[in-house]
């Protein structure tokens, strides 16, 4: 799929997103600048749209980086324990720093996400049986252990209601003044683009990268820091969005290959389009109520994930 088609789809869905919601807004309301309707647009609809695009782009690119560095197509922030570690970090910030600002919570979540990701990579190094399906299963089990610890302490300290908002992604609470920290993902995405060629070389293996004169560990650490920071920002602002970083890079690699320089723009655009489409679907299925983005992406993403697994097995046969 060409970039211009993805870009056109993004524009069309973005315009549709502005007009879909409980409060009816028409094109004439915008043309005549209806004060009440425009207030809804600027306080709720526009911040929601921006956060959807930023989250979709950044999480998809995070998944692509993780798959390249781990050399496994089914590794992502969801299947490597990164998102679960970030969630644990948010809980720790609620327990220990009750008056912490969103930035301070994000830093704690980042530290935990980075620690969890590094731990997963260390586990990965020690596993001799590196089957494409086995590795993400290990990551899912690792993430479930962290998630269980999070739930235990949330119940113990009566914070289960607080942490529930981070268990499942939801854009319905995104409003002006409550999402701006997500903008920090933008420079991280830019750095990912600048390091695209290095990530591609690192994906060839440590020996290959070192022979080419590249500092493999430095590139690996930069990639993991980018993934961990983005995961912390998205979990803190929106909540967990499953499968996104897993399925989007796999879909793009089918028609663009594995070179990050070529696939990054397509991954970013398709990620934004996919999340935006799922969000719109969640808003119209049971209108005037809405389904959370975590549930919508989870249902659709799991189906796509199964298709990718079967497609891989078919080609292997």
Please tell me what each predicted stretch does.
Residues 1-317:
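Alpha-helical transmembrane segments in inner-membrane proteins
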């Amino acid at each position: 799929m060409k970039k211009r088609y993805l870009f056109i789809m993004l524009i069309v869905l973005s315009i549709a997103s502005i007009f879909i919601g409980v409060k009816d807004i028409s094109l004439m309301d915008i043309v005549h600048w209806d004060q009440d309707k425009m207030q809804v647009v600027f306080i709720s609809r526009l911040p929601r749209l921006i956060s959807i695009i930023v989250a979709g782009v950044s999480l998809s690119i995070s998944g692509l980086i993780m798959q390249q560095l781990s050399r496994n197509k089914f590794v992502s922030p969801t299947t490597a324990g990164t998102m679960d570690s970030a969630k644990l970090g948010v809980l720790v910030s609620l327990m220990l720093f009750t008056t912490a600002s969103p930035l301070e919570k994000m830093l704690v979540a980042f530290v935990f996400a980075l620690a969890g990701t590094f731990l997963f990579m260390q586990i990965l190094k020690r596993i001799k049986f590196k089957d494409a399906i086995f590795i993400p299963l290990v990551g899912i089990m690792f993430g479930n252990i962290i998630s269980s610890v999070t739930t235990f302490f949330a119940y113990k300290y009566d914070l289960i209601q607080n942490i529930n908002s981070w268990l499942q992604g939801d854009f319905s609470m995104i409003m002006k003044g409550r999402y701006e920290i997500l903008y920090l993902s933008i420079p991280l995405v830019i750095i990912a683009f600048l390091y695209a060629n290095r990530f591609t070389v690192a994906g060839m293996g440590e020996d290959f990268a070192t022979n080419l004169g590249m500092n493999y560990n430095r590139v690996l650490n930069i990639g993991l820091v980018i993934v961990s920071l983005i995961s912390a920002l998205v979990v803190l602002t929106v909540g967990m969005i499953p499968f996104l970083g897993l399925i989007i890079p796999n879909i793009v690699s089918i028609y663009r290959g594995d070179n990050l320089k070529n696939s990054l723009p397509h991954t970013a655009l398709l990620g934004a389009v996919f999340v935006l489409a799922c969000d719109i679907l969640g808003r119209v299925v049971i209108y005037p109520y809405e389904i959370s983005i975590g549930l919508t992406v989870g249902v659709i993403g799991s189906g796509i994930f199964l298709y990718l697994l079967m497609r891989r097995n078919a080609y292997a046969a």
